[in-house]
From Swiss-Prot:
Its EC number is 2.7.8.13. It is an enzyme of class 2 (transferase). Pathway: Cell wall biogenesis; peptidoglycan biosynthesis. The keyword Nucleotide-binding does not apply. It is a multi-pass membrane protein. It comes from Campylobacter concisus (strain 13826). Keywords: Cell cycle, Cell division, Cell inner membrane, Cell membrane, Cell shape, Cell wall biogenesis/degradation, Magnesium, Membrane, Metal-binding, Peptidoglycan synthesis, Transferase, Transmembrane, Transmembrane helix. The lineage of its organism: Bacteria, Pseudomonadati, Campylobacterota, Epsilonproteobacteria, Campylobacterales. HAMAP family: MraY (MF_00038). This is Phospho-N-acetylmuramoyl-pentapeptide-transferase. It comes from the Bacteria. It is found in: Cell inner membrane. Catalyzes the initial step of the lipid cycle reactions in the biosynthesis of the cell wall peptidoglycan: transfers peptidoglycan precursor phospho-MurNAc-pentapeptide from UDP-MurNAc-pentapeptide onto the lipid carrier undecaprenyl phosphate, yielding undecaprenyl-pyrophosphoryl-MurNAc-pentapeptide, known as lipid I. InterPro entries: Glycosyl_transferase_4, PNAcMuramoyl-5peptid_Trfase, PNAcMuramoyl-5peptid_Trfase_CS. Belongs to the glycosyltransferase 4 family. MraY subfamily.
Length: 354
C-alpha cells in the first residue's frame, strides 16, 4: 500500500525499502501486542493448552495449562504488515507470504491434532508432517527456479566466487534447506523465549544480506551476488521481527503463551527461505547455530541409542539436558541467546571477509 502511495502521489519517502521495513516492524509489533492478550484469553477459554510430554523434565509440568498456537497471531500480523508495506508485485515477497501462510497452516493442523483434536503431544504423524513440509518447500523452490528470480550457483561463506552451478538440482537442495530450518526451529522451541530471540537475530542478519544483495552498488562493493528484487524481502523479515518481538512480550519467562508448531514451523521455514534467497544456505549453519546444535543433539541421541544402546545426553534436545543437570531455565535461555548473538555477529563478518 505505502509503495503505491509513492507511485500515485509521488510521496518519495515510501519508495525506500528501509522506511517501509521500519513501518512494517511497528505495525506488526503493535498489532501483535494488541491481539495476543485477546488470543490468550480465547485459548484459555477453549482449553487450547500445550500437552506436556510425560517424560519431559518435571519443571515443565507446571506449564501444562499454558495456551499455545501463538504463532497464528504473530504470523497473521506479519502478513498484514507485509501486505500494507511491501510491493506485492515482487516475486520474493509473494514467495515469502506463501511460505509463512502454508507452513503456519501446517503447524496449525499439527497443533489442532495435539490440543483440540486427539489430545496427545505427538500431533500429526512424523511422516505426514514431513511430507507436507517437503511439498510446500518444493513448491517454493520450484517457483524460484522457474521464475528465474534466483540463479542456481552454489556459494560458500567467506568466498566471493560461486563454487559450481547446481542447475535443476538446486530445487532439491533449496527444498532440503527450507525443511531442515523449519524442523530445527521447531525442535528448539522448548523453553520460554528460546526459539524467538535466536530467530530474531537470524532474521536481522539475513535481512542485512538481503538488503545488500538487492542493492547494485553495495553488492558490488562487498562482492556479494547481485539478486534483483531480493531487497524487498527485508520488509517481510522486518514485519516478522516486529511480530516476534510482540510475541516475546508474552512468551518471556514465565510464558503466558507458546508459539506452537504454527509459529515454529513457519518461522524456521522462512529463515531457511531467506538463506536460499540470499545464497547463504551454508552460512545458515552459523546464522542459526543454536538451531543446528539443538537438531544435532537429537540426531546424535537417536543414532547413539539405536547403534550403541547408549544415550549421549540426559535428554534431547540439548536444552533439556541442561535442565536435568540442574541449570535454571532462565540461565539456559539467556546463555543460548548470547551464543546466538555471537554466532550472528560472526556470520556478518562474511560481508567483508571475501
Amino acid at each position: 500500500m505505502f509503495y503505491y502511495i509513492y507511485e500515485i502521489l509521488n510521496f518519495n519517502i515510501f519508495q525506500y525499502i528501509t522506511v517501509r521495513a521500519g513501518i512494517a516492524f511497528f505495525i506488526a509489533f503493535i498489532l501483535t501486542a494488541y491481539l495476543m492478550p485477546k488470543f490468550i484469553a480465547w485459548a484459555k477459554a477453549k482449553n487450547a493448552a500445550q500437552p506436556i510430554y510425560e517424560l519431559a523434565p518435571q519443571t515443565h509440568q507446571k506449564k501444562a495449562k499454558t495456551p499455545t498456537m501463538g504463532g497464528l497471531v504473530f504470523v497473521f500480523t506479519a502478513v498484514i504488515a507485509t501486505i500494507i508495506c511491501a510491493r506485492l508485485d515482487n516475486a520474493f515477497v509473494l514467495a515469502s507470504l506463501f511460505c509463512l501462510v502454508c507452513f503456519t497452516l501446517l503447524g496449525y493442523k499439527d497443533d489442532y491434532s495435539k490440543i483440540l483434536g486427539a489430545k496427545n503431544h505427538a500431533g500429526l504423524s512424523p511422516k505426514a508432517k514431513l511430507f507436507f513440509q517437503f511439498l510446500i518447500a518444493f513448491l517454493l523452490a520450484a517457483f524460484l527456479y522457474i521464475s528465474k528470480e534466483l540463479n542456481t550457483e552454489f556459494y560458500l561463506p567467506f568466498y566471493k566466487q560461486p563454487i559450481f552451478d547446481m542447475k535443476i538440482f538446486a530445487i532439491f537442495f533449496w527444498t532440503l534447506v527450507i525443511v531442515a530450518a523449519s524442523n530445527a526451529v521447531n525442535l528448539t522451541d522448548g523453553l520460554d523465549g528460546l526459539a524467538a530471540v535466536p530467530s530474531i537475530f537470524s532474521l536481522l542478519t539475513l535481512g542485512v544480506f538481503a538488503y545488500i544483495c538487492g542493492h547494485a552498488v553495495f553488492s558490488s562493493y562487498l562482492l556479494l551476488p547481485k539478486i534483483a528484487g531480493v531487497g524487498e524481502s527485508v520488509v517481510v523479515a522486518s514485519a516478522l521481527i516486529g511480530s516476534l518481538m510482540g510475541f516475546l512480550w508474552f512468551n518471556c519467562h514465565p510464558a503466558e503463551v507458546f508459539m506452537g508448531d504454527s509459529g515454529s514451523l513457519s518461522v524456521g521455514a522462512y529463515i531457511g527461505f531467506m538463506g536460499v534467497a540470499t545464497k547463504n544456505e551454508i552460512l545458515l549453519i552459523i546464522i542459526g547455530l543454536i538451531f543446528v546444535v539443538e537438531t544435532l543433539s537429537v540426531i546424535l541421541q537417536v543414532g547413539s541409542f539405536k547403534i550403541f544402546k547408549r544415550r549421549i545426553f540426559l535428554m534431547a534436545p540439548i536444552h533439556h539436558h541442561f535442565e536435568i543437570k540442574g541449570w535454571a531455565e532462565n540461565k539456559i535461555i539467556v546463555r543460548f541467546w548470547i551464543i546466538a548473538l555471537l554466532a550472528n555477529l560472526i556470520a556478518l563478518t562474511a560481508l567483508k571477509i571475501r
